Amino acid sequence: MTHALNLKLANPKLAAPALALALAALTGTASAQDAKAGEQKAAMCIGCHGLPGFQHSFPEVHKVPMISGQNAKYIEASLQAYKKGDRKHPTMRAIAESLSDKDMADLAAFYETHQRPGRALKTVADTPAVQPSAEVAALLAKGACASCHGVNFNKPIDGAYPKIAGQHADYLYVALKSYKVEGNPLIGRNNAIMATQVKQYTLAELRAMSRYIASLPGDLRVVEQSKFR
């Protein structure tokens, strides 16, 4: 902005373009995401994520994740990962490949703010409402899970990390297991940090942690939507 103002004093003819560029730089991030546009693009998402209790059968039967209330930055990064093949799920990859970067940003903005009409969101305490057993507490400490996902697992240190408190236990378990998979073109997630963490645990331990995290209150929810709008 300082450069633009100096330009204005030196040459009035250059002032307008310079100021326009400066303002565009300041407002570009805000306009990159359009929640209203995302709502209009969500038709392909509703069939799974807009139905309470909807289950997917690949790679095993589990509830699809709740995404309403999730961090926009994380949703967008997840869609990009499916598109690039870093996350391997045939259905999600096909959907992601059909989306532009703008589509992903709009959908992410929509789902981050998506809530049930007329219902105010409850404030989630900064400390876990339910304390884990000694065994589960030791497992969580071993992986330093709270250092990224937050002490209450609902307030991660960065929007690129997911809120996981209250997420479906069976989904969390399947998602965690997927980081153990290597060399499979249809199943698995490429994330070096998560892969290193998850490989420390047995499947029984992953299930125990998933059940505890799912028992916690959080912002995630399923907002039922009609396919016909």
List the model feature ranges, each with a label.
Residues 35, 61-66, 72, 76-122, ...:
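Acidic (E/D-rich), amphipathic helical modules within compact regulatory domains
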Residues 1-12:
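N-terminal secretory signal peptides that target proteins for export/translocation
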Residues 97-122, 197-225:
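C-terminal capping alpha-helices of c-type cytochrome domains
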Residues 28-32:
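Sec/Tat signal peptide C-region and signal peptidase I cleavage site
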Residues 33-55, 125-153, 225-229:
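Sequence/structural segment immediately N-terminal to covalent heme-attachment motifs in c-type
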Residues 43-46, 106, 115, 120-123, ...:
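Intrinsic, low-complexity N-terminal interaction/targeting segments
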Residues 39, 53-82, 93-98, 138, ...:
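Gly/Gly-Pro-rich "capping" loops immediately C-terminal to redox-active cysteine motifs
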Residues 15-25:
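Bacterial N-terminal signal peptides
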